[in-house]
Amino acid sequence: MFNYEELFQTHKTPFYLYDFDKIKQAFLNYKEAFKGRKSLICYALKANSNLSILSLLAHLESGADCVSIGEIYRALKAGIKPYRIVFSGVGKSGFEIEQALKLNILFLNVESFMELTTIETIAQSLGIKARISIRINPNIDAKTHPYISTGLKENKFGVGEKEALEMFLWAKKSAFLEPVSVHFHIGSQLSDLEPIIEASQKVAKIAKSLIALGIDLRFFDVGGGIGVSYENEETIKLYDYAQGILNSLQGLDLTIICEPGRSIVAESGELITQVLYEKKAQNKRFVVVDAGMNDFLRPSLYHAKHAIRVITPSKGREISPCDVVGPVCESSDTFLKDAHLPELEPGDKLVIEKVGAYGSSMASQYNSRPKLLELALEDHKIRVIRKREALEDLWRLEEEGLKGV
């Protein structure tokens, strides 16, 4: 059992705490699942892009799935090799494309014909051949939250089969494009294996057709999306996921690229917060804590439910339903409704569980609240991996503008 009390002697709440041993094991589980075939596990930085987490994964020979030039430079800074980096995203700017090509990353996942011709023009100006992959939208329902579904025709991501074929043929004829991969990603927090296998089989069939047309594919990029159990719900077994994809690739000599994010880091993270007040309003019990929706947005944005437990001794206190809420001036600043918690006092400490993914990476300074301290637990030792922002950091980049006032 981890001794939180020692932690509270040196660090004030709220803060994030990550168990690096859990991250390491989660990544190694992916490597083991795909070991029967040439594969590259590209961690999706969007889930959590802390440099120390990236460095840990770099030492395990992880690749990186990046969706901005900032994420690419983060990956490189942490030691991930350029030839293990893929650049995804529906809205890459010309500057980002140029930088990515100059850095000689593995390839760019292309989302539209217009983006393809933009990459071609930039590659021509640089006098190089751009390695590209085309993201195919298989029009398959991932059966997940609509905000994180990406594989239906009404979603903004990828292109249909007909347009993908036209794009591949265009790239094949171009002196400045080199099509090396097919790509799909139907959504995040997936709990049903069937849509993933269906998409994999559909795109594998397309890949075979492309190879028959003389397109020299080398990679099969399956995206990510395996969900984690936030509320004890059924999740996809990694072995079944890997075997389903491997079976769909029979007859294809391609390296599999998998882009997990949430399933690598989610369960490693805790948000430690303390009670400021208890209040009752018209017989409704509220527990007000010092963390807010700016620190952890998922419950407010997705109505996501994360278990909350009390780590301050509370034996003998009466348990009753309550809403755990933050101090931000929004009614949506709620971490959990109808949580069954004991009567709490100011200073009592709570843990919000499984916040390693899309926690700190989605945090903001809303309400002029500094971003949180982040700590790592590794080999039974605690170290700081991101300092808490100071109040002065909130306006540091704005001070120059005051000189003209």
Swiss-Prot record:
<feature type="binding site">
    <location>
        <position position="262"/>
    </location>
    <ligand>
        <name>substrate</name>
    </ligand>
</feature>
<feature type="binding site">
    <location>
        <begin position="259"/>
        <end position="262"/>
    </location>
    <ligand>
        <name>pyridoxal 5'-phosphate</name>
    </ligand>
</feature>
<dbReference type="GO" id="GO:0009089">
    <property type="term" value="P:lysine biosynthetic process via diaminopimelate"/>
</dbReference>
<dbReference type="InterPro" id="IPR022653">
    <property type="entry name" value="De-COase2_pyr-phos_BS"/>
</dbReference>
<dbReference type="InterPro" id="IPR022643">
    <property type="entry name" value="De-COase2_C"/>
</dbReference>
<dbReference type="GO" id="GO:0008836">
    <property type="term" value="F:diaminopimelate decarboxylase activity"/>
</dbReference>
<dbReference type="InterPro" id="IPR022644">
    <property type="entry name" value="De-COase2_N"/>
</dbReference>
<feature type="binding site">
    <location>
        <position position="225"/>
    </location>
    <ligand>
        <name>pyridoxal 5'-phosphate</name>
    </ligand>
</feature>
<feature type="active site" description="Proton donor">
    <location>
        <position position="329"/>
    </location>
</feature>
<dbReference type="InterPro" id="IPR009006">
    <property type="entry name" value="Ala_racemase/Decarboxylase_C"/>
</dbReference>
<dbReference type="InterPro" id="IPR029066">
    <property type="entry name" value="PLP-binding_barrel"/>
</dbReference>
<feature type="binding site">
    <location>
        <position position="358"/>
    </location>
    <ligand>
        <name>pyridoxal 5'-phosphate</name>
    </ligand>
</feature>
<dbReference type="InterPro" id="IPR000183">
    <property type="entry name" value="Orn/DAP/Arg_de-COase"/>
</dbReference>
<dbReference type="GO" id="GO:0030170">
    <property type="term" value="F:pyridoxal phosphate binding"/>
</dbReference>
<feature type="modified residue" description="N6-(pyridoxal phosphate)lysine">
    <location>
        <position position="46"/>
    </location>
</feature>
<feature type="binding site">
    <location>
        <position position="298"/>
    </location>
    <ligand>
        <name>substrate</name>
    </ligand>
</feature>
<keyword id="KW-0210">Decarboxylase</keyword>
<dbReference type="Pfam" id="PF02784">
    <property type="entry name" value="Orn_Arg_deC_N"/>
</dbReference>
<feature type="binding site">
    <location>
        <position position="302"/>
    </location>
    <ligand>
        <name>substrate</name>
    </ligand>
</feature>
<comment type="pathway">
    <text>Amino-acid biosynthesis; L-lysine biosynthesis via DAP pathway; L-lysine from DL-2,6-diaminopimelate: step 1/1.</text>
</comment>
<keyword id="KW-0457">Lysine biosynthesis</keyword>
<dbReference type="Pfam" id="PF00278">
    <property type="entry name" value="Orn_DAP_Arg_deC"/>
</dbReference>
<keyword id="KW-0456">Lyase</keyword>
<protein>
    <recommendedName>
        <fullName>Diaminopimelate decarboxylase</fullName>
        <ecNumber>4.1.1.20</ecNumber>
    </recommendedName>
</protein>
<dbReference type="InterPro" id="IPR002986">
    <property type="entry name" value="DAP_deCOOHase_LysA"/>
</dbReference>
<keyword id="KW-0663">Pyridoxal phosphate</keyword>
<feature type="binding site">
    <location>
        <position position="358"/>
    </location>
    <ligand>
        <name>substrate</name>
    </ligand>
</feature>
<keyword id="KW-0028">Amino-acid biosynthesis</keyword>
<comment type="similarity">
    <text>Belongs to the Orn/Lys/Arg decarboxylase class-II family. LysA subfamily.</text>
</comment>
<feature type="binding site">
    <location>
        <position position="330"/>
    </location>
    <ligand>
        <name>substrate</name>
    </ligand>
</feature>
<comment type="subunit">
    <text>Homodimer.</text>
</comment>
<comment type="function">
    <text>Specifically catalyzes the decarboxylation of meso-diaminopimelate (meso-DAP) to L-lysine.</text>
</comment>
